[in-house]
Curated annotation (Swiss-Prot):
Keywords: Cytoplasm, Hydrolase, Nucleotide metabolism
Transmembrane segments: none
Descriptive protein name: 7-methyl-GTP pyrophosphatase
Domain of life assignment: Bacteria
A GO cellular component annotation in the UniProt record: cytoplasm
Compartments in which it is found: Cytoplasm
Pfam families cross-referenced by the UniProt entry: Maf
EC annotation from Swiss-Prot or TrEMBL: 3.6.1.-
Organism (species): Shewanella sp. (strain MR-7)
Amino acid sequence: MTPQLILASTSVFRQALLQKLGLAFGSCNPDIDESPMTNESAQDLVLRLAKAKTKAGATHFPHGLIIGSDQVAVIDGKIIGKPLNRENAIKQLSQASGKVITFYTGLALYHAETGEMNAQVEPFTVHFRQLSAAQIAAYVDKEQPFYCAGSFKSEGLGIALFNRLEGRDPNTLIGLPLILLTEMLLNQGIDVLAD
């Protein structure tokens, strides 16, 4: 019997992405401490948090197949997460203006019953346009990207902030790498293309 698919996230963006695959799924709030550890790299951080989210989800769904995802950006060698407010969003976008920024998304798929864990990091690179302070403020006020790593929504007006995007899956930038997820699901016997 196929275990129930659970998204360990309350993100409406991740839920909307997962719905694209046409699979029935539930969701839960993983409620974990997302603080980085001392000297932890961005890749290690998102991998650890994605795994932790699946394990937290498994406490609610002990027979589930749990999906966990986490994302950060790196600007000038510093890990950047969600801005949480207008001031921080403007600061993040000002720092990113004219630069090439890499986003790292950790994706984990955990079979709670068997203990099998598959976790990987998917990078995605963004080339920001040179942005004026007025453009940044106008964007932040229009889209209020306070709960998005890097302070933008690439699926919306945020696309106007960029010169170029580089990566295997544009969904990665929104927070859930669907190409990688479909590969992981296939390894669990779930083919999203099957009848």
